[in-house]
Amino acid sequence: MAKKQEYGNESIKSLKGADRVRKRPAVIFGSDGLEGCEHSVFEIMSNSIDEAREGYGNKICVTRFLDGSVEVQDFGRGIPVDYNKNEDKYNWELLFCEMYAGGKYDNGGDNYEFSLGLNGLGLCATQYASEYMDAEIHTDGYKYTLHFEKGENIGGLKKEKYDKKDTGTRIKWKPDLDVFTDINIPIEYFQETIKRQAIVNDGVKFILKNQTSASKFETFEYCYNDGIMDYVKEIAGDTAFTTPQYWECERKGKDREDLPEYKLKIKSAICFSLKNQLKEYYHNSSFLEHGGAPEKAFRSCLLYTSPSPRDYAAS
C-alpha cells in the first residue's frame, strides 16, 4: 500500500536567510552545478565592472586559487558598508545579507547609468552560497573588513582609519560544495569571460592570476583601449578587405508612454574579411550567445542602409 502523504496547513514552509539560496541555488544562479558556480563568480566580477564602467578605477584583478576559492579586487569607490539612515541599518547587512538591496534601482542613473550586475541579488546570493567570504573595503578614509561563513556573519563590521589614498573593494570567497555539486571552475572559463569583458569595456585592464602550485601563479592581462574596434581589427588581421567601421550613439527611450525614460548607448564595429567569419553581440556587456534582439536590430539596420544593386547600376 502506498504511503499516505499528509499535506495540511503545517506543510507550508518559508525559507529564511541563507537557506533561500543554499537550498535552492538554481533559482538565482540557474543551476546547482558548475554553471551555477560560474554564474556566482560572474556576479562578483560584474559589480567591479560596473564601477569601472562609471569611470571609477581602470583595473580589475581576478585570482583563481587551487582550492577553488576566487578573489576579485577593484579600485573603484568602495562598497558603502557603513550606517544607512534611510534604511536604519548598516549597508553591509543590506548588501551582503538581504536580497534585493543595492544601488542600481534608480532608473534616473544617479548611481549607475548602465549596470551589468543582478541589481541587489548577486553579492548577497554569492555570499549565501559560499563556504566563507572575506571582504575588505577602502572608502571615505577607512578600511572596513567583514567575514562570513556559510551565509552567516562572524564578528560584525570592523572599521579602522586608513591613511592611504587608494579606494576599492577586495572580495575573496570559496563556493560551497554543500550548495554546488562542483566548484572546480576551469581556467578557460575565466580567460574567455574576462577577455570578453575587456573587449566591451574600453581601456579597463583585467589581470587574471591563476595559482598553479603552492607558491606559483601564472598571470594573464587583457585590455582593449579602443574596445570592440580593436577586437575587430585583431580578428580581421591581414585578411580584411574593407576598412573597419565604427559607430556609436546615445539615445533615450521608453518601453511604454507612461513609464520613465532610460538611457541607451549603442556601439557597433564591422569589417569584412576574406577568411574569418565572426559575429558577436553583447547587452550591458553580457555576451549574447545567440545574438537575440541586438543581432536582429543590427542586421535590419545594415540591410536598410546598404545600397541596392540598382543604385550602383544607376551610377
Residue positions per predicted region:
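Short beta-strand elements
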Residues: L264-L274
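Conserved ATP-binding N-box helix of the HATPase_c
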Residues: E35-Y56, C124-Q127
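Single conserved hydrophobic/aromatic residue that forms the stacking wall/gate
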Residues: Y304-S315
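A conserved short beta-strand within the histidine kinase catalytic ATPase domain
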Residues: N58-T63
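GHKL-type ATPase core
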Residues: A2-S11, L66-N91, G102-A236
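Alpha-helix capping/hinge segments and adjacent helical runs
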Residues: G17-A18
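Short histidine-centered catalytic/ligand-binding loop motif
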Residues: V179, I183, Y282-P294
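Conserved short strand/loop->alpha-helix "switch" segment adjacent to the catalytic nucleotide/phosphoryl-transfer site
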Residues: K23-V41, E113
